[in-house]
């Protein structure tokens, strides 16, 4: 590891993660025209954001930076894979890793893995259906479309908010921060699907101001403690999302992790670490029994 990378990793442990994220969140929600227009224009240039596919192309039309960052796309901008039974990629970005869940652990980077149960909030019962299953981790870069969509149609069973740190998420931290994704703040969404249980985990990171879901809105319990929300109780109307429907969004980016049970899916042979992906592409197909 280079000296520059060592300094960067050291800074990750020293910086006040949540304070920085709150301050940046305030700036991202600022509606002052002189500020938000300059910030949006700088960001679009810096990260070469393609506005031609956005529903709103005019950078000055957004009420604040977060509205720009979570911008909707034009109809048809992300066609859904048509292969029978296709499991869709949930987001734009790049595959960080994908593969089997072995011995209750998920591969993070060379020399690093993390606990499946810890990712899901330390609940062994929640983790049990995914033991021996498969995972895919998708990293969303700053220039990407930042809404997350359903890989399969599913009925929401449970949502778990898991408090944690807000380490930056990139290749350097993945290779040098142990159990990165099981330490960062995250929202676990559990669904029943035609391929059995499926989890979509939205992982926060440094300067990620917030995580939202379409059914709960902003997910930030006031005391930042682990909190479980059940949606399969008789008193609640079922929440069902169709394949390709929006599930949630990041206000300033990070990572989506998808989990499946054993012998349910076979990942697209063309995908591997660092493969660029777009929401709606074929991530996997049903595994043949």
Swiss-Prot record:
Active-site residues per Swiss-Prot or TrEMBL entry: 92 (charge relay system), 149 (charge relay system), 254 (charge relay system), 254 (schiff-base intermediate with substrate)
Pathway it works in: Phospholipid metabolism; phosphatidylethanolamine biosynthesis; phosphatidylethanolamine from CDP-diacylglycerol: step 2/2
Modified sites of kind Pyruvic acid (Ser): 254
Cofactor annotation: pyruvate
Topology of this chain in the membrane: Peripheral membrane protein
Any one cellular-component term (Gene Ontology): plasma membrane
Primary location group: membrane
InterPro entries for this protein: PS_Dcarbxylase, PSD-B, PSD_type1_pro
Single annotated GO MF: phosphatidylserine decarboxylase activity
Signal peptide span: none
Cofactor binding note from Swiss-Prot or TrEMBL: Binds 1 pyruvoyl group covalently per subunit.
Localization (cell): Cell membrane
Its EC number(s): 4.1.1.65
Known partners and oligomeric status: Heterodimer of a large membrane-associated beta subunit and a small pyruvoyl-containing alpha subunit.
Protein family per UniProt: Belongs to the phosphatidylserine decarboxylase family. PSD-B subfamily. Prokaryotic type I sub-subfamily.
Protein name: Phosphatidylserine decarboxylase proenzyme
Species annotation: Pseudomonas aeruginosa (strain ATCC 15692 / DSM 22644 / CIP 104116 / JCM 14847 / LMG 12228 / 1C / PRS 101 / PAO1)
Gene field: psd
């Amino acid at each position: 590891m280079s000296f520059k990378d060592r300094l960067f990793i050291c800074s990750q442990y020293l910086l006040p993660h949540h304070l920085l994220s709150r301050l940046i969140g305030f700036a991202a929600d600022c509606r002052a025209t002189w500020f938000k227009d300059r910030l949006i224009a700088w960001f679009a240039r810096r990260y070469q954001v393609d506005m031609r596919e956005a529903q709103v192309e005019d950078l000055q039309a957004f009420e604040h930076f977060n509205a720009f960052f979570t911008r909707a796309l034009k109809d048809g901008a992300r066609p859904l894979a048509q292969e029978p039974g296709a499991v869709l990629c949930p987001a734009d970005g790049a595959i960080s890793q994908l593969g089997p869940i072995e011995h209750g652990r998920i591969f993070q980077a060379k020399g690093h893995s993390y606990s499946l149960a810890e990712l899901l909030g330390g609940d062994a019962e929640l983790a049990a259906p995914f033991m021996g299953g498969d995972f895919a981790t998708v990293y969303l870069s700053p220039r990407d479309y930042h809404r997350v969509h359903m890989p399969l149609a599913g009925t929401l069973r449970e949502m778990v908010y898991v408090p944690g740190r807000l380490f930056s998420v990139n290749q350097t931290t993945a290779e040098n921060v142990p159990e990165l994704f099981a330490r960062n703040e995250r929202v676990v969404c559990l669904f029943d699907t035609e391929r059995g249980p499926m989890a979509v985990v939205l992982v926060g990171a440094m300067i990620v101001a917030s995580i939202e879901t379409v059914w709960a809105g902003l997910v930030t319990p006031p005391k930042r403690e682990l909190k479980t929300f059940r949606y399969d109780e008789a008193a609640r109307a079922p929440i069902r999302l169709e394949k390709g429907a929006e599930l949630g969004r990041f206000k300033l980016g990070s990572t989506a992790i998808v989990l499946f049970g054993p012998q349910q899916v076979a990942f697209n042979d063309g995908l591997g670490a660092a493969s660029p992906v777009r929401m709606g592409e074929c991530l996997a197909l049903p595994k043949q029994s």
